Amino acid sequence: KVPNYSVGDSVIVTGTTSSYGGLLQYPNTSTITRSGKSESYKYPKAEEMDAATLNSWMKSPVVKYAKVSGKLKISGNYYNVEITGLNGQGSISYPMTGIVDPALNGKDVDINGYLIGVTGSSTKYANIMMTSICEKGGTMLTPIGVLATSAAGEHKAEGVVIAKYARGFLISDGTGKMLVYNSKGYDVEEGDVVAVDGKTSLYSGLMQFNSPKVTKLERTAKVSQPVAQELTAADFTSYVTAPYYAYVTYTGKLSITTNDKGATYYNIAIDGTSAQGSISFPLTGVVSPDLNGKTVTVTGYAFGQSSGKYLNTMITTIAEATPAKAKIAFRAGANVQPNASVLYRLEGT
């Protein structure tokens, strides 16, 4: 499943572990619940691993944040790394589509990421959960998930456009998400891979790029959205005091109003809380005026709060709610599917 978390999120994982690739792991039937997030997160210093140290590690693997260098070989959905002297190969495990530039195929690269086990029979593979990649000797970009908790300043990022609205878009590289804002919007589409260069600042409780330079790169990606987190009334109440980026769904009564300056607001009243959903600057035609006053189900990205009351939503779909959907939209303890990109923090025993 596509991850619905960012690095630095705190989560509670419940499940039965088993051994795979020489390491213990949780199965895809595990329950994961978000319990908070770090206000400032950085990866540890990457340990440089040459062929000798990797050979030793492969005999007795442990999770380790490392820097690995070698020749990248891309074949379909496989991203293997040939390392001279290694009794096997490196393998980038399930990177987000579009993040590894196909132009790097056949070139020497540097990779930062977590070593997460050894698989294979005739050929052994050291599996890497990649956080960044560049041509050998180049400059590693800071992962978006880290930028999202870093101090405001001048920053660069590359990632996939995963959603857009009239004033910008969300970008992701698999480690996290950030809003790229411009009051005039950008000529990009979902699935475009872009480079972003500009200033970041804290707004609506989350870090975002403000009117940066955006360059479309010569590749695109197929975007698959995560399983949406079903928000309860309690989730709304807590979100407006501690916002986070996530793909969400919720049900409530839509109110469309226009003020004397011509600004239109799309707010959704939620039973059981004074907090509300707010569809932020939807693209033309996405929200039908016929839905005004009706109970609707909204799905999209939560990306901050306004006035301590509104959960800002970059909408992907909206529809009149069926009675069955209205009943389940506020159930407690909705399960979020596990993923391969979150840094787990286990709570309890």
Annotate the PLM regions:
Residues 1-349:
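OB-fold single-stranded nucleic acid-binding module
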